Swiss-Prot record:
Residues 23-41 form a propeptide. InterPro entries: Apelin. GO terms for molecular function: apelin receptor binding; hormone activity. This is Apelin. The record marks M75, F77 as: Important for the balance between G(i) and beta-arrestin pathways induced by apelin-13-APLNR system. GO terms for cellular component: extracellular region; extracellular space. Keywords: Angiogenesis, Cleavage on pair of basic residues, Developmental protein, Gastrulation, Hormone, Pyrrolidone carboxylic acid, Secreted, Signal.
C-alpha cells in the first residue's frame, strides 16, 4: 500500500512540474513561441462548387442523360 501511494505522489509531482514548466507540448518545431509560430493547415479548404469550371459559365446545365437498359432494345440472347 505504501508503494502505491509513493507512485501516485511521484506521478502527481511529475504532472504538476510538467504543467508549470510547459513541457514539450508548448514548444513549436521552429523554436518560436506559440504566438509567433507558423500555423500549418493539413487540409486545404474547398472553394464553392458553383464557380466556373472547365466549361464557361460553370456546370453544363443541359447534360444528356445516359439511356437506361430498357431503352437499348431486347437482349441478344
Amino acid at each position: 500500500m505504501n508503494l502505491r501511494r509513493c507512485v501516485q505522489a511521484l506521478l502527481l509531482l511529475w504532472l504538476c512540474l510538467s504543467a508549470v514548466c510547459g513541457g514539450p507540448l508548448l514548444q513549436t518545431s521552429d523554436g518560436k513561441e506559440m504566438e509567433e509560430g507558423t500555423i500549418r493547415y493539413l487540409v486545404q479548404p474547398r472553394g464553392p462548387r458553383s464557380g466556373p469550371g472547365p466549361w464557361q459559365g460553370g456546370r453544363r446545365k443541359f447534360r444528356r442523360q445516359r439511356p437506361r437498359l430498357s431503352h437499348k432494345g431486347p437482349m441478344p440472347f
